[in-house]
Amino acid sequence: MVAKVWSRVILIFIATVMVFASSQQGDANKVNTASPPGANGIAYASVVAGGSNHVSAAGSVTGDGVQLPNAEVDIDWLEEHLEDSHDYEKGYDLVEQHFNKLLVGNNADASFKVRELASRLILGTLRNNPPVKRLIWDQHPLFVSQVFDLYIGNALKQGSGNPLKYPLLKRYLSILLELIPFNRDFRFEEDYKDILDKLYTESDVPSDIKIKVLELITLDYSNIKGASGWIDRITNVLTDSEMGLDELHKRTFFNAMHALKSEDPKLKLPTNFLNWLAQETKERAHNLKLAQAQADDNDLKVRDLEQEEFDQRLVDSRHSVFGNPMAARMKDPYIVDEL
């Protein structure tokens, strides 16, 4: 695994050199303070001398003797383009023409303010914009690795006293949630899961961060197959009313448990999940009866067929997947059954 990590770091370094090689030289009147390359060979952005509103990947020399040109990122520039990031065409242009600036803005030596703005801008371009996702995967295939290994890793090293730490981490998780589902060939490396595990287990991590971590880990069910720790976390969040899960997250996490149990009928799930499932079955079966009654009465109320389909799936699975398949008709009077 260590060899894989280092090989990926080397690839990230090569990609970074190629990105910066296309950037323009910074204003000659500004004095840039270069940071030496880190242990992984990547030259990080540094704060420009004389003002914290700029960061720059200043002419650092890598171990291979490659000179990285300046690529300045100005807070004013980031703020000016935030609105453009949400526009379908302008967002694409930002990524196509200025992605190198956004990479610099997220590096370790950039201030939290710059990283917050740069990451917000990237996320804005990604939402509801498949061409941008395709562009990033095509032209910056190691970006997701950078987010895991560098951006999240660096943010985790900061103390909890910084009020931007968790908003920044949440932004990075959201970026991953936009990009990873777009690439069917993506596979989670073990160190990615280790990073997510470290983030999830931080003592003061907010609940919304935990939910996003679980969203990521359930993008590929093989991540949690045979991993009792992740299964316990998912079922704990799913069954904890204080987490305030919305319906979409309930579906996501239930579907993960459904898939695991369907594949491995011998899998033992926590009692709290089975108790939650029993209560959910009762409530959702009742809702299904009401929906059917309204349909029979020609009620003009618009039906949520997607919701009804999921409710029926959950109700049916209580015994067919998570219990005794023969018990459905005998033990559950709430089952909606069309004979």
Swiss-Prot record:
Pfam families given for it?
Answer: SIL1
Q: Which UniProt keywords apply?
A: Endoplasmic reticulum, Protein transport, Signal, Translocation, Transport
- Any one Gene Ontology BP term: protein transport
Q: Where is the signal peptide?
A: 1-21
Subunit structure of this chain's protein: Interacts with KAR2.
Q: Which family does it belong to?
A: Belongs to the SIL1 family.
- The name under which this protein is listed is Nucleotide exchange factor SIL1
Q: Which organism is it from?
A: Candida glabrata (strain ATCC 2001 / BCRC 20586 / JCM 3761 / NBRC 0622 / NRRL Y-65 / CBS 138) (Yeast)
Per the record, the gene is SIL1
